[in-house]
């Protein structure tokens, strides 16, 4: 992530807020921190709505109650707490995500699956934080990058 690159991407865009997505590894969390700092920078000034931890754990199809933390445990959860930001969701690695993608069927279609439940929880969290943001901050405007 670079401030200059991000300025080019968001210039002339109306951005309600940013959602930072990361995996739980320390190196990925370092990049997530940079992303948070970039959006909160005075030149960009985009509110952070929250964090999403992708690949939070692996759950095998045969043992859906088991969780294997392949990339570390609660990395985004801890970062969210440290940065005083909401953790919007922890999305597991589930074999069905890959299979559904290969078949062209959204993984969330099977409403009983852990994947669908994770994405539904994420969607509900996003609605909550956007409503909260809209209640306490001015209406979304086109981002004007301050080059001072």
What role is predicted for each listed range?
Residues 2, 28, 115:
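Short, conserved glycine- and acidic-residue-centered signature motifs
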């Amino acid at each position: 992530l670079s401030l200059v690159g991000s300025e080019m991407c968001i210039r002339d865009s109306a951005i309600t807020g940013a959602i930072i997505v990361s995996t739980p590894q320390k190196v990925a969390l370092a990049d997530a921190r940079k992303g948070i700092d970039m959006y909160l920078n005075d030149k960009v000034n985009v509110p952070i709505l929250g964090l999403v931890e992708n690949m939070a754990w692996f759950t095998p199809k045969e043992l859906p109650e088991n969780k294997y933390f392949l990339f570390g445990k609660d990395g985004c959860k801890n970062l969210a707490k440290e940065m005083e930001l909401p953790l919007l969701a922890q999305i597991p690695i589930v074999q069905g995500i890959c299979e559904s993608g290969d078949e062209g069927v959204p993984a969330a279609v099977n409403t009983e699956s852990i994947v669908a439940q994770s994405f539904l929880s994420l969607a509900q969290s996003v609605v909550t934080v956007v409503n909260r943001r809209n209640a306490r901050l001015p209406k979304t405007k086109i981002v004007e990058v301050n080059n001072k």
